[in-house]
Amino acid sequence: MRKVTFILGALLLLLTACAPEETGYKWREEWDSGQPGGGGDDTPGLPEIKGKPRYVWVDAAANFSYYANDAAYIAEDCKRIAAMGFTDLVVDVRPTSGDVLFTSAVAPPCLKCAAWVNGKYRWVERTATFDYLAAFIEAGHAAGLRVNAGINTMVGGYHSAIGDVGMLYDHPERKSWGAVDNLAAGLTNTMDDADTGPRFLDPANADVQAFLLTLLGELAGYEGLDGIVLDRCRYDDYNLDAGYTDAAKAAFATYLGDEPSAWPVMPKGQTYVPSNPSTLQRNWLTFRCKVIHDFVAAAAAKVHEVNKDVRFGVYVGAWFSDYYRSGVNWTSEKYDLKKNESTYKWVPTGYQKTGFADQLDFIFLGAYAGKDSIHGSTEWTMEGFAKLGAQRLCGVVPFAAGPDIGNATGFENGKQEALLPDIVKTMLSTCDGGMFIFDLCHIRMFDYWDAFKTSIDQYLETL
């Protein structure tokens, strides 16, 4: 009876949070059945998934020293990943440099990544010529895993203390593709910013969007690929200072029907929405989310145009309460923001329509809470992130949430094997689309192979 009461309560909560429209996943049965067609017509039959999907992320830079030049190592680890009980890989094939680890006619190949190796930050070079993504697809399928390609989306270069790499450095004529931020020194193109890190692209730039859609079309045509996941599909920063390119100003003027009365819209140093934002500021924040929404919709259409059976999704941080700072609204269009979110009381009517969850086949929520914050009902607890995610998505798309087991508070030095069974159980019991773990490099670094196998085995025994 208590279980029934809990389920009814959860359903009532969803109904009050979301507009009362009929919902339904675009998830196709064959994606779970292991039958041919689950990831394209050329995908061999894969074992049926028992329980909910279990994804492990494979970051390009963090794993580059292992896989960039060794297809045999890829095959060996795919077997180990499957033996742990994972069902899916998300293989990063476009690191933050914007260069790619798959065959492309428009993007340069990734020949080096900056990474920590044996305690030193250095370049790891790729001299091998085998197709990196194809090697993962072949080895993953042979091990019984589904293989999804992850790409860092709105990026085009990486600036580090040991040098620079990426498209924006190789093509100075594309500087106008770069983000422009409202920094202390004034409006600054990302290529003129001294800070290290990714060089972000301008999401409002039509040339940037066309380039990325072409890239996604190439990726969707990859033989045997099961899915595509966009990462960093957002604006440059978390501080409301991004988006002030000439292309964005022109597009914003079109959106308003007039020239903006102030540019930049937000004052320097504004990191959160003001307590009483102006009409222009409300429209600007809505416009940025609309830009991302419209790109995600176009990306989904491009992927499914090339191959209707390739799943399309996005990774986002689960901390939605201030995710407007990145220009992203990952909720469903049906979600009632003003009613349910205390930090979104300022939104105009059009903001709700910028939610892009309805465009997706699956979505990944980064539940990156610390080791002492597994349980709870609020943000910055793993369980709370997942529960709130379910409310915000309104049942329109299956979601997988998961922890960062190497960088989140308390996980940095490993030795957290004892927590993994509880984390696995909590994520899989709370998320309708499974769980994901970030990242494979941390499983290797802290020797969590056996601990994850035990944790997933315990979950499977409950089915």
Regions found by a protein language model. Give the residues of each.
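Bacterial Sec-dependent N-terminal signal peptides
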Residues: 13-49
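Active-site-adjacent "subsite" loops/lids of carbohydrate-active enzymes
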Residues: 46-68, 148-222, 274-281
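Catalytic domains of carbohydrate-active enzymes, especially glycoside hydrolases
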Residues: 72-99, 222-226, 352-365, 426-435
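Aromatic-lined carbohydrate-binding/catalytic grooves of carbohydrate-active enzymes
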Residues: 86-128
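Glycine-rich, aromatic-flanked loop segments that form ligand/cofactor-binding clefts
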Residues: 86-97, 132-191, 229-232, 308-313
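Aromatic- and acidic-residue-enriched segments that line the glycan-binding/catalytic groove
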Residues: 101-114, 155-194, 232-272, 325-337
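Substrate-binding cleft/loops of secretory-pathway carbohydrate-active enzymes
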Residues: 156-159, 163, 238, 306, ...
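Substrate-binding cleft of secreted/luminal carbohydrate-active enzymes
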Residues: 346-463
